[in-house]
């Protein structure tokens, strides 16, 4: 009988950097290697990625990486895993493979293409990896041809699904194969691992509230000028709907995102969208068009940055006209409300009509009834919700309990908590891995301790004060000269001069308080140096708080000359 372990390196009690590890006996399967972009401004932090230390220590056992829904939250840290640990085979859909290759071609993933081993899986075709049978199946999600995975073990199936909805539309791009895979898995599913989606936030099924054709037609049909539509690059469903409207209304169609242009071309090549009579033009022709539909699409952080530039007339291609119409199609995401409000203010200032459909149209994720259908059909012994906050997991549990699930069936895990199932029985003891997620800034990978993030917040909000003190080794004494640098500290000149005077008095007092800074070797000992720098930092911080109500980051250093 199989011994199974499951744990998350990211994605639990957070939205993003999804990364899950499944151990079946001695074999390891990784699901997703995503990244997270901070929704609040943290100075210099571009993204946060999982801690891959465990994978590095066990890389010989890793059989592959499985990516069913190829969005940033699921593949955004691929290059960092490959550079810090090594290359592993990737198993994904043809669309997923296209997205990964496109990002590599644009150098968004700093990976040599010839080192990649990407396996494009075919739906419902079982593959064998190290004596394990794995069956991919299509699920209806925001990207075409998204996959769920069913792994067969001696104890029953383990089913992994990121996002899905129950959908019976005859749309080959967003085909749902749950009805075909369920008979194979029903009554023999040991573990269901599934994204929490909209469960607990939206009762009923997600469909038809995810559809946008009617709302978009209502806005676009009477509009005389250009139509700008902003949406995340994970929302291919809406982009394809806009292309359909452009074709029906004989409007030129523009996608302002080179990576999404590649994805759209792949979708067309795979005959997932009929582009006959669709007039697609490049973004360079935007100013020659009077009635085009322009899709502005990127990951959330880059999309908002792009919209800011356009709103401030700093974009090299787009200038708003009074005849334009703007449509927001981004879902409500905690942390982005203020940014979104600022962008809409910029649009209004340009006298452009705008509409916000983000509250009307649901993202393509499971709602209450979708999840109830999946659970009641598969009848899993255990269920693990993923990809959400703790409160989402609690709501998920309440919804499924109302549908008849038992409390002990639903297992809530935090990052690093290791769940063990042996002979179909859950081990009541949870081991825990110590994880240290990394942040990516302009200098590359950095540690992400609480103190580091706090200091970055300080720098972004109040600036930095650098204090340099000089120590003469020959005379074994401090010089009177002290150098100050104020970076990003908003103070007028008289206030700054007054602060410098007070700071100098404080620092000289701190120096005088240290009586044993000289040694036989006529140098400052490490402990004395550290004590002095900490003392100066505290004193200057208190001074700033009292005199300015600001709290900049204080950096003090001692230079021996």
Swiss-Prot record:
Transmembrane spans: 29-49, 80-100
Q: Please classify the protein's predominant subcellular localization into one broad category.
A: membrane
**Bilayer topology:** Multi-pass membrane protein
Give GO MF terms, alphabetically.
metal ion binding; RNA binding
Q: Which UniProt keywords apply?
A: Cell membrane, Membrane, Transmembrane, Transmembrane helix
Q: Which InterPro entries match?
A: RibonucZ/Hydroxyglut_hydro (IPR036866), RNase_J (IPR004613), RNase_J_2 (IPR042173), RNase_J_b_CASP (IPR055132), RNase_J_C (IPR041636)
Task: Give the protein name, as stated in the record.
Answer: Uncharacterized protein MG423
Q: Does the keyword Cell membrane apply?
A: yes
List the GO cellular component terms.
plasma membrane
Subcellular location, record wording:
Cell membrane
Tell whether Cell membrane is among the UniProt keywords. Answer: yes
